Amino acid sequence: MTRMVAYIISVILLLAVMAGGCRKKLADLYYDPDQTVQPSIEKFFTQMLNNDRVRPSYWNVRTFVVMHTGIYTQLTGYLNNTTAYQQNASYTQDRWNDFYRPGTAADGGNGGIMAHYRLIESLYGSIQDDQQKTNATVFLMAAKVVMFDQASQIVDLWGDIPFSEAGSVNTSGDIVAANFENAANVYDAILDGLKNAALYFSSAQLPTSVHASFSKQDILLNGQFDKWQRYANSIRLRLLMRLSFVNEEKAKTEVLNILNNPAVFPLADGGANYVPLSTDILLQPLTTYVDDLHLALTEVFNYSAPDYMLNTVMKPVNDPRIPALFDKYGRTDGDQFIPNTDYNGLPVSFNAEQQQVNLGRYAILDSATFLFNSKLPGIVITASEVNFLKAEAWERWGGGDAKAAYETAIRQSITFYYYLNSLNTSTRMPLTQPAAAAIDTFLQSDQIKYTGTANQKLAKNWVQKWVHFGFLQSVQGWAEYRRTKNPALQFYPSTLPGYELPPSRLVYPSSETSYNANYASVKDKDMRTGKIFWDVK
């Protein structure tokens, strides 16, 4: 693939110039036009936010989501080819690269969360004037939140990762083969960092001109300190719940402290005032973006409605989200199009040939909401997820109304997907939000109603959160599926030896196995059947 060739070339160039040229090249990309001799922390910060691994870009969806996490979670439809569960080494190398280093000029220099963060650290450390340093702190703290959020996802995909030493060439100028750090320790560092960042934003005060500069460069939250605080606290809640089966005492103590002190630890939970655009943490597309996902989802036949989600979870309860998520579709017979009369997901029990010849008989992802929607935002975290997390915590440990949080999460999920549908006004008129009575009836159906044993209620919560994630958040969906073992998915076994079923982690890319001498410390556990530290259920 062209991006892999570009990567190989970039590695060669990196080895040639790493002693000094790498940092200079990055800095040259983002000179402040008002200060022609100093690279700009502000511009590096904006570049951290401008992330096509957060936005639903063609490349991320086509090469990572629909070939990896979407399949491993059954959040996308897919063909049961023999290689369906085999990791694509080139594409997962790309995913790794896009965290650790910026892209080439050919792909817009996108990505490089860790590299840009280290440059911000370095520039911040070089500031001598106390007032200037105080003013620059807001960019450093926001950059920390973004880096911690993205680093947690790399841990969730691979496990132990280079972290505290990663990108050190951009701070010290020294070439260091970064050690692989224990995943649990990385999580601890992330959790502490998120807490400190949230507390900073709770009381930060800046001169008007500095706040205006931050707002201008902040293409994620437009300089709103309250939302940065909620963002950091919400990601912290997500990660604490993720480790709650391996370190329940820590998770319980810290989560209940968050939930019992909403004035100190506000969350992006929305409550009765939920409006997706203003409540959720969403990365909007650039104003120049005109692409959509129809090629990413159709090139390898990933547009069919997932079997378990539609047939087992949603149809039996007449889920109000169905019209926003799916089209009934149809098939062509001669020159006549025969529309399907109902929503049905493509059976996962079919072999690949049966699936392909029958695609037209089954529902597909909604064309207005997903296939041809150029306005889809990148989803960082939503109020619905936050309330599902609150419901789980209160169900397991008490202290709040788990039922109310669960029902709020589902209501917000319905609103969210109709919001996504409403963003596309070019292919058809937006759908009307379901009536309140229809949603109330849905919430009282046996499969959805918050009744049963504690384990049954937790399972309902986890399944509904899985539905809410969908393919757009399949990285989170895969993490939660492995953590909770819900829903109870069945996979069509592949005949390819060693790849009969989906993996429980990604194996490390060749950039680490071939060029990082410290890979030896993790080599023995670098197996697709290995487990991330929180995967103990």
Located regions from the model:
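Conserved, well-structured interaction surfaces
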Residues: 79-164, 168-204, 208, 373-378
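Internal, well-ordered domain-core segments that constitute the primary functional module
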Residues: 188-270
